[in-house]
């Protein structure tokens, strides 16, 4: 038997084969093209590629399972896609339309890749289909300065109100259901300036509290009972100065943005600190006041900096790319929050420096509240609320793609409901 440095050659070959077949964070796939425009009845071929890495050229994956709008192979309504990646749009598909193409890639560190098909010449459009509000400053109004919105395990809305020092629960239709925790204060289960609430797979509610002597992360049961505190004030690893956004990965680990420490911290569900990534600085992977975050089905992490851009990282915090730089010719754009859907799309809430009257104007003359991008950072469309003026907003996306967008104007505070037309 042949040997190399005392090791049987057959064992070296077996080890090399195993390494080649084991996906690492370097064996990432991408989709080409990542966005395409077709006419009704038109077609577009997509392909998945395993990216080149050190001493390894780009290569085709062993197999790709294609779907259209989550339907394997697609159908006559949304279009079909073959094993060769050729998408065919129906001749009678309504326009404008946005179609999601997904490839499940064998042997890739990121299991899924998503591409976007824009059908027709116009930009995809969202329509306000409902909503509700309270009159700001009245005795009946509970909300004073609503800040963050999410959906709990029962499909109800959780709204963090920084000025009221409370986290409210409403039905999607606006019926008040109660509060999370014990109201304003700095004791356990109380809030000073709550920013956001997010639920884990069991329905437990995790919250960020921003200012005061005790910025921290708190955990409550699904029915709102206090459970524990972690991530208290400080600059050391595992500590928080100004918590803002939260999200869970597929393993149940909690990711939390820290605006002032300029990083993302990762915790076990019980609160044990695991690791962190990011820092203040001018480099590509550095942050500039990180506010919100969203994890897709690959556990890739999207982090929006308030001053831009938004950055995408792999699950270990390795930088991938940036998008949404916020530098239009007519002035700066500020990105307050980010959320996402199950098709890997990212939704950024935006405004200009002028606040109420500073909404970003779209090319259709409407004020933009949300900018939608696909998983690869390609711009998809602008989304406008019917509220003409509002401060910084936050949005959440339901499993069916419905957007619930939180707002506060000079006289109203509430939620608008939007669906893609």
Predicted segment positions?
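Bacterial N-terminal signal peptides that target proteins for export
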Residues: 1-8
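Hydrophobic h-region of N-terminal signal peptides that target proteins for export
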Residues: 10-20
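Short S/T/G/P-enriched beta-strand
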Residues: 21-55, 108-127, 131
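Short, well-ordered beta-strand segments
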Residues: 55-74, 114
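Low-complexity "stalk/linker" and mucin-like segments enriched in Ser/Thr/Pro/Ala/Gly
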Residues: 68-88
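Extracellular/luminal low-complexity segments enriched in Ser/Thr/Pro
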Residues: 82-96, 186
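A short beta-strand micro-motif common to beta-rich folds, especially ectodomain repeats
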Residues: 95-107
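Eukaryotic scaffold repeat domains enriched in small/polar residues
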Residues: 120-421
């Amino acid at each position: 038997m042949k040997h190399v440095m005392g090791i049987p050659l057959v064992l070296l070959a077996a080890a090399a084969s195993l390494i080649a077949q084991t996906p690492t964070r370097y064996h990432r796939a991408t989709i080409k093209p990542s966005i395409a425009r077709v006419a009704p009845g038109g077609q577009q071929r997509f392909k998945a590629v395993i990216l080149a890495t050190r001493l390894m050229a780009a290569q085709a994956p062993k197999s790709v399972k294609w779907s259209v709008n989550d339907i394997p192979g697609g159908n006559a309504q949304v279009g079909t896609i073959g094993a060769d990646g050729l998408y065919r749009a129906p001749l009678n598909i309504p326009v404008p339309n946005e179609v999601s193409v997904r490839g499940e890639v064998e042997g890739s560190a990121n299991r899924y890749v998503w591409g976007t098909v824009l059908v027709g010449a116009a930009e995809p459009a969202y329509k306000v289909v409902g909503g509700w509000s309270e009159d700001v400053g009245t005795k009946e109004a509970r909300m004073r300065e609503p800040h963050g919105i999410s959906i709990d395990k029962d499909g109800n809305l959780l709204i963090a109100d920084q000025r009221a020092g409370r986290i409210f629960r409403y039905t999607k239709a606006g019926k008040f259901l109660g509060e999370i925790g014990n109201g304003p204060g700095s004791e356990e289960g109380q809030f000073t300036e709550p920013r956001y609430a997010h639920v884990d797979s069991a329905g437990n509610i995790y919250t960020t509290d921003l200012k005061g002597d005790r910025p921290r992360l708190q955990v409550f049961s699904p029915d709102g009972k206090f459970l524990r505190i972690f991530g208290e004030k400080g600059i050391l690893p595992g500590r928080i100065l100004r918590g803002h956004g939260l999200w869970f990965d597929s393993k149940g680990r909690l990711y939390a943005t820290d605006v002032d420490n300029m990083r993302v911290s990762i915790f076990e569900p019980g609160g044990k600190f695991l690791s962190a990534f990011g820092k203040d600085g001018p480099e590509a992977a550095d942050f500039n006041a990180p506010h919100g975050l969203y994890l897709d089905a690959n556990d890739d992490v999207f982090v929006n900096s308030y001053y831009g851009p938004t950055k995408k990282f792999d699950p270990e915090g390795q930088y991938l790319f940036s998008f949404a730089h916020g530098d239009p010719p007519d002035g700066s754009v500020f990105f307050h929050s980010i959320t996402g859907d199950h098709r890997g799309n990212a939704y950024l809430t935006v405004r200009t420096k002028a606040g109420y009257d500073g909404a970003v104007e779209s090319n259709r003359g409407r004020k933009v509240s949300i900018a939608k991008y696909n998983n690869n950072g390609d711009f998809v469309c602008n989304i406008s609320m019917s509220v003409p003026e509002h401060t910084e907003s936050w949005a959440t996306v339901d499993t069916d793609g419905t957007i619930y967008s939180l707002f506060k104007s000079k006289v109203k505070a509430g939620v608008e409901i939007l669906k893609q037309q």
